[in-house]
Amino acid sequence: MHVTLPDGKQLDLQAGATALDVARALGPRLAQDALAALVNGELMDLMTPLPEGAQVRLITKKNPGDAAPVFRHSLGHVLSQAVGEFYQRKGYPREAVKRGVGPAIENGFYQDFDLPEPLKEEDLPEIEAIMREIIGRGLDIVRQDVGKAAALKHFSYDPYKVELIQELPENEPVTFYAQGDYVDLCRGPHFPNTGKLPGAFKLMSTSGAYWRGNEKNPILQRVYGVAFATQKELDEYLERLEEARRRDHRKLGRELELFLIDPLVGKGLPMWLPNGTVLREELTRFLREQQFQRDYQGVVTPNIGNLDLFRTSGHYPYYSDSQFEPLSVDEEQYMLKPMNCPFHIRIYASKPRSYRDLPVRLAEFGTVYRYEMSGELNGLTRVRGFTQDDAHIFARPDQLKKEFLDVLDLTVLVLKTFGMNDVRFRVGVRDPASDKYVGDPAQWEVAERQIIEAVEEVGLPYTVEPGDAAFYGPKLDFVVKDVLGREWQLGTIQVDYNLPERFDLTYTGEDGQEHRPVMIHRAPFGSLERFVGILIEHYGGDFPFWLAPRQIMLIPIADRHNAYAQTLANEFKAAGLRAEVDDSNNRMNAKVRNAELHKIPVMLIVGDQEEARREVSVRERTPEGHKERKGVDFTALLAELQERYRTRA
């Protein structure tokens, strides 16, 4: 067999040769330094036989980061071995520790266990120390191919491995990887030796996880770790993680009294507290203003609908796994609304439409319900009941590009208004090899071309992702990077040829004939809950003045200044601003500290001098730090803050 190197050179090797054989053919030093290989663009370990004609690039200790998924996978095996040794040192037999799966994941690895007694967080440092012992032993990591019967016999004590092995094809070898006396069922890839694994790793946490993600299965204990090629990368990651903890929307949501999730109300069903309600209403007011300027029409639809509506749309039964069970009322079946679009379609269809009427733009802040497994729920970002800023545009095919551009412009405006300036687009188009798509291929080609043209006109970076389109039409996802460098998919625009067909939507064309409209789904926020959760973390709770639930805190120096402070607060309120007075018995410094803890952007201190001159002393929270101004005329400040609120500066 032969393989091709990055410089185009070809090597002739024996059949069944591995990447390690390639390294040996190029020299003993390279064989010593090699860690993994990129084979036909995919990561592979040094022990796996190469395919004929493969293109091979060796990864060495000079660039270990290129093999991060491989060393993270191997560290997962080291973790698994270390947990086994941890329990053996406690007197348990080797077979007492049973194992689920343990893949490499972004930034690290995890391993699932069925343990004789639960691991505690305080056990993790000891297990990490055992991992470092195993790395220090310099154990060769060896690939082994065995028959299915032998594999079942080896793991007869472990029901999880037995289940996985039984699902494998009968006549194919089962792959094990061994290091020392530890053996695991695994396809690889792995580093060649534990001694070559980086020491820049850390065990982070332990939690419960259902076997194979199914709530009907046993709960296993999952241990998470992170790993990087260098200590510098690990330290930087841990710093970012600490900053993320400080910004965690669940923590800040409690501290700033924004939302509440009460177990008696139900998991994944957030309630908005007064401060959070202000935040939510500012978001909806902003978007309603933008939609009004773009000729959207507001609608309101029920929270439940007849099951036949969702049968017609196809949401039931095709998406029934992510929906709540139907309920029976008066011999009819109803379902909690999983999506707003079928309701908007029925509004469109409620009267005849002419080509002159189109486009019809229907918008709603509509609450929908999706069944999420309890293990996937997370604060506001993964919930069971949420409100979408949903709109559906019914347009003629010749209007598609213009409407798409307008929605694109609106969504970019929304994101940039909230300081999310690092935006890229992901255009989802058909996979030419798939037959899952509905609609006329010629229409698809026009729609895909017009979406790409629209994106290019905006001038932001984009990628085209074949196969990422929905079955009913191409789509555009907005991917935003926040201040922590994390990427979020916020907002989607989807072109839909399917639902107009299913509901037999028409309009009368200029030729007097009935024609099928094209439909656009759009939601710039996606959902208010998720968007607010991301906003809280993006701003770290330090919202801009116009968005802050509590905008102004007046701080009297002494009790005799309370009346003056209240007079000013009333004038702020009359001007539409949110102001309050801290008339507690605390000292002034304590009042300032309390306002700081609640991240109130504007603090106004008033004493004898300020009252005599109708002035205030201003202390502001800004992204650059605190900004202080003494003796500011109140009337001028009121006008300044009104303008900031009006312009959302």
From Swiss-Prot:
Binding positions for Zn(2+) per the UniProt entry: C341, H392, H521
Top-level EC class: ligase
Residue ranges occupied by any TGS domain in the UniProt entry: 1-60
Main location: cytoplasm
UniProt catalytic activity: tRNA(Thr) + L-threonine + ATP = L-threonyl-tRNA(Thr) + AMP + diphosphate + H(+)
Keyword annotations: Aminoacyl-tRNA synthetase, ATP-binding, Cytoplasm, Ligase, Metal-binding, Nucleotide-binding, Protein biosynthesis, RNA-binding, tRNA-binding, Zinc
Cofactor: Zn(2+)
UniProt-annotated stretches for the region Catalytic: 248-544
UniProt GO cellular component terms: cytoplasm
SUPFAM superfamilies: Class II aaRS ABD-related, Class II aaRS and biotin synthetases, TGS-like, ThrRS/AlaRS common domain
Location in the cell: Cytoplasm
EC number: 6.1.1.3
Pfam family, one: HGTP_anticodon
PROSITE patterns named in the record: AA_TRNA_LIGASE_II (PS50862), TGS (PS51880)
Biological processes per GO annotation: threonyl-tRNA aminoacylation
Cofactor binding mode and count: Binds 1 zinc ion per subunit.
Any GO MF annotation of the entry: tRNA binding
UniProt KW Protease keyword: no
InterPro entries reported for this sequence: aa-tRNA-synt_IIb, aa-tRNA-synth_II, aa-tRNA-synth_II/BPL/LPL, Anticodon-bd, Anticodon-bd_dom_sf, Beta-grasp_dom_sf, TGS, TGS-like
NCBIfam families given in the database record: thrS
Main function: Catalyzes the attachment of threonine to tRNA(Thr) in a two-step reaction: L-threonine is first activated by ATP to form Thr-AMP and then transferred to the acceptor end of tRNA(Thr). Also edits incorrectly charged L-seryl-tRNA(Thr).
Family of this protein: Belongs to the class-II aminoacyl-tRNA synthetase family.
Subunit structure of this chain's protein: Homodimer.
Protein name per its UniProtKB record: Threonine--tRNA ligase
